[in-house]
């Protein structure tokens, strides 16, 4: 469900903008947003297994495509009015909008190779890049060159594929390739429009947009990764992470200092290729990764195993390669792979699938190939840091363990860290004078950071629970904000919360992590 919500994020806004631009007469911009919405629906359809839901979304897609065709026809009429009357061809034949294909210029028609087998007449060869050669048209299609008076839908790119075998398979290939090409064209146009929108909204910290820096064969995958995993402003600072001073120092040395002192980190002092953070759940590993990206000002890629999963053969490996290419384009950048044990566990197991093994191999190649010595055009270094987090470090493949050169243990918070975390959690609420933070910290020994946060949240809500106890629904609705928020958090609230919230980490889990640290730790 998380992947479905991500694939539909912003769909309503895209459709709203598309219709607003169409009403204003900006048909080109409207078509771009319509194409983006159709691409999102196509991605969502790939995640659906329910036939009823797929049928509903197919009807939605069909309605949007019909609306897009209307906008394209309006744009064609507008362009026709702008053209000079003398520029129209004499006796131009009417354009059949119901045709299964749109005519191409004469120099883009394919021909059969001499001596070779006859090509399928329903499947066209890819166009040649040699614009100087003139090739004869297909029989019966002479004189169908497009004029400037034709609409944009008639002058747009046609759906062509390479040679395929006769039968239904060739038609399916033609449709899938056409959808990919139209989606690519829509994303290219949307990228130029999004630069202006981002600068107005102020999403980028420095006011500059780096979209369009990726140059590679997988622009569709790059656009998908930009939308799903790119987070340029995580917004977490060192002060938001309580304790963990040793982990902060190591991460600062591995990630932040090479950006501040690039001339020092040369040769044997080169930055680390990868850092693995392991420890019990809820100790702040993900929060530390976001703080690293914020403090050193790098672009943050938050990756999970679901992001790199695909049902198509070879697609997951391409996504891994495209992710690292995109990270180099956005350098300096940080690739954070959460729960890496689910993506790259030990190879050679009896239940391991072939596709999973290929993804692991590609990830190992890319992590090993991360070069921190390349530079941009302005001379700045292209630093790509791989950060990984796991609760099961003993399940990680040993080859990946070698590539993650720094392996940092993130333990449960100690007494001072628990005090700092309680103060951080309570900084937005009013605290009564009888609250003893040190006593609460002593009584929560063995609690993880998430457990402490749950204790503070539960304690801060006890005042509201006392206020609404015994009241009807209408009485609760009529209560003012001051009536609810006036009660400060008291010590009795913490005592009740500690009784209800138990620690989620067992001592046996801590022993296993400490044993692995003594064997493979590299702090």
Curated annotation (Swiss-Prot):
Name of the protein in its database record: Katanin p60 ATPase-containing subunit A1
Biological function: Severs microtubules in vitro in an ATP-dependent manner. Required for oligomerization of functional KTN80-KTN1 complexes that catalyze microtubule severing. This activity may promote rapid reorganization of cellular microtubule arrays. May be required for reorientation of cortical microtubule arrays during cellular elongation. Failure to correctly orient these arrays drastically compromises fiber length, cell wall thickness and mechanical strength. May also be required for the spatial organization of developmental cues within the root.
GO terms for MF: ATP binding; ATP hydrolysis activity; microtubule binding; microtubule severing ATPase activity
Main subcellular location of this protein, as a coarse class: cytoplasm
Catalytic activity: n ATP + n H2O + a microtubule = n ADP + n phosphate + (n+1) alpha/beta tubulin heterodimers
Biased composition (Low complexity): 178-194
Membrane-spanning intervals of the chain: none
GO cellular component terms listed in the entry, alphabetical order: cytoplasm; microtubule; microtubule cytoskeleton
Top-level enzyme category: isomerase
GO terms under biological process: anisotropic cell growth; cortical microtubule organization; leaf pavement cell development; microtubule cytoskeleton organization; microtubule severing; multidimensional cell growth; plant-type cell wall biogenesis; trichome branching
Keyword ATP-binding: yes
Residues that bind ATP: 279-286
Phenotypic effect of disruption: Severe dwarf phenotype, with small and round dark-green rosette leaves as well as wide and short petioles. The ipga1-2 ktn1-4 and an-t1 ktn1-4 double mutants have an enhanced phenotype of pavement cells, resembling soap bubbles and no lobe formation.
EC number(s) reported in the record: 5.6.1.1
